[in-house]
Design a protein with these regions (language model features):
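Well-ordered, non-membrane alpha-helical segments in soluble/globular domains
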Residues: 30-31, 104-109, 137-146
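C-terminal domain-boundary segment and adjacent tail
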Residues: 70-71, 121, 126-173
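Aromatic- and acidic-residue-enriched carbohydrate-binding clefts of CAZyme catalytic domains
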Residues: 1-18
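A short acidic, often aromatic-flanked loop/helix-cap motif at beta-alpha or helix-coil junctions
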Residues: 78-80, 92-99, 161-164
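A conserved mid-domain beta-alpha-beta active-site/ligand-binding segment of alpha/beta enzyme cores
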Residues: 85-135
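A generic secondary-structure signal
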Residues: 36-39, 113, 146
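Catalytic domains of cell-wall/extracellular-matrix polysaccharide-remodeling enzymes
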Residues: 17-93, 132-137
Length: 173
């Protein structure tokens, strides 16, 4: 909706590609992307994350069509086929495109690594450009170090295992 469009315009550098796609185009791109990544890594992918975590209605519908086991946005990880939420809460992430984004990333991550530590699942997203900025790399190290005091590192596929065991999952309303 309107909030996603505002995010795409002001919070990204044009990465909201899946925001305006219809179902068929989103489906085509998801299949092509999955094939490419699986060919590169030699293993199946666990799920799909839209650029900038922005999905339009067509992309949300295509997720279940394509058969991705999970998807994520800024606030949750869910199973597209059922709507079951596998993890809820904001993702800790950094932005390296400008001094202002670097500064806001440092402030948010410092607060989030402590404030979110009580959640059952805390997600951390690192982009390739983030590791080229020394202050962000230090922040990433501190964040992961702090979270490893109370959490075990895992993969998205682990959330699917937990779902099958009925752990963490609540139905998306």
């Amino acid at each position: 909706g309107a909030i996603a469009a505002i995010k795409a315009r002001h919070m990204t550098a044009g990465e909201g590609e899946f925001l305006g796609l219809d179902r068929e185009e989103a489906r085509r791109r998801m299949i092509a992307g999955r094939t490419l990544i699986e060919d590169i890594i030699g293993a199946p992918v666990a799920g799909f994350v839209a650029p900038a975590w922005l999905y339009g209605p067509g992309a949300r519908t295509a997720l279940a069509d394509v058969g991705f086991a999970l998807a994520e946005d800024h606030m949750r990880v869910w199973a597209p086929d059922s709507g079951v939420v596998l993890a809820r809460g904001p993702v800790i992430t950094w932005a390296s495109r400008s001094r202002g984004r670097i500064a806001s990333s440092l402030v948010f991550s410092a607060l989030a690594r402590h404030a979110l530590a009580g959640l059952g699942v805390v997600r951390v997203a690192v982009h390739p450009g983030d590791v080229t900025v020394p202050s962000l790399l230090t922040s990433i190290d501190r964040t992961i170090g702090r979270l490893l005091q109370s959490h075990q590192a895992g993969r998205y596929a682990d959330l699917l295992f937990d779902r099958d065991r009925k752990k963490y999952a609540t139905h998306c309303g």
